[in-house]
Regions:
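Class I S-adenosyl-L-methionine
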Residues: 1-80, 90
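Short hydrophobic/aromatic-enriched beta-strand-loop microsegments
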Residues: 22-30, 79-80, 100-106, 151-157
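Generic beta-sheet signal
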Residues: 47-54, 102, 127-131, 188
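Short glycine-rich anion-binding loops that position phosphate/pyrophosphate groups of nucleotides
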Residues: 55-59, 135-137, 195-197
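Class I SAM-dependent methyltransferase SAM-binding "motif I" and its flanking Rossmann-like core
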Residues: 67-125
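Anionic-ligand binding region
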Residues: 116-118, 138-180
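A C-terminal functional module that forms or caps the active site or interfaces directly
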Residues: 169-211
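Single conserved hydrophobic/aromatic residue that forms the stacking wall/gate
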Residues: 214-221
């Protein structure tokens, strides 16, 4: 490896110093321009090897790296992955909820319309749903969950793999009450129970049947 593209060079430098690793660090984060990524690609094409490191999680999973990997693929550059910590799978495993099928939704938008549309699209999703959330937005998000999804079971995973790791398992309404009396701290992974499965005949009412009576069926000779 010739250089390291880091989300925060200060954070990565502490890790490198801890293990006495001497490598050039360059900044590559969520606000980096396309020009920055193209510069990295250019250096790799010139014969150098690079690593991508993020501060607290797996690169590309709600962290920088996705665009860079895409550019590498388009340029025919081989990309190797070193499996690292992923809060998504860790939180799912410890949630106590269904782990066979799940959907990771990342951070919800702060735009009210986009946020509402996103949550509405998930209302009937039967898979376990996983979200990331910041502490100052937690109660608002829990209230939105109650509004759009009802009072489902939820696992609130805080500061996973860190000193103050905590996992709370309760219902959404219980979580709202808890955090109205306990100040949220740290980064959260929210694992929400999926919607109940409905039989395909559910909702096929007499009104539905009548609505089809005007249709003319084709005649087969």
């Amino acid at each position: 490896m010739d250089f390291i593209a880091a989300e925060d060079t200060r954070v990565t430098l502490k890790l490198l110093n801890r293990y006495d690793i001497k490598k050039q660090l360059i900044s590559y984060h969520g606000h980096s321009t396309l020009n920055c990524a193209e510069n990295i690609i250019s250096r790799i094409k010139g014969g150098e090897n690079a690593a991508v490191v993020t501060d607290a999680g797996m690169p590309c999973i709600s962290d920088p790296g996705e665009e860079l990997v895409r550019l590498c693929a388009e340029s025919g550059i081989n990309v190797k992955v070193v499996p690292g910590p992923s809060a998504v799978v860790s939180a799912l495993a410890v949630s106590g909820l269904n782990t066979s099928r799940f959907a990771f939704e990342g951070f919800l938008s702060v735009n009210k319309k986009q946020r509402s549309d996103h949550l509405l699209s998930l209302k009937d999703e039967t898979r376990t749903l996983i979200f990331y959330e910041a502490p100052h937005k937690l109660i608002n998000t829990l209230n939105d969950f109650l509004k759009y999804f009802g009072d489902r079971r939820i696992s609130l995973c805080r500061e996973l793999t860190k000193v103050y790791e905590e996992v709370l398992r309760m219902t959404v309404s219980e979580a709202i009450l808890y955090y109205e009396n306990n100040n949220p701290k740290g980064e959260y992974v929210l694992v929400l129970e999926g919607a109940e499965r409905r039989d395909i005949s559910d909702g096929y009412t007499l009104e539905t049947a009548v609505s089809y009576t005007h249709l003319t069926l084709p005649t087969i000779l």
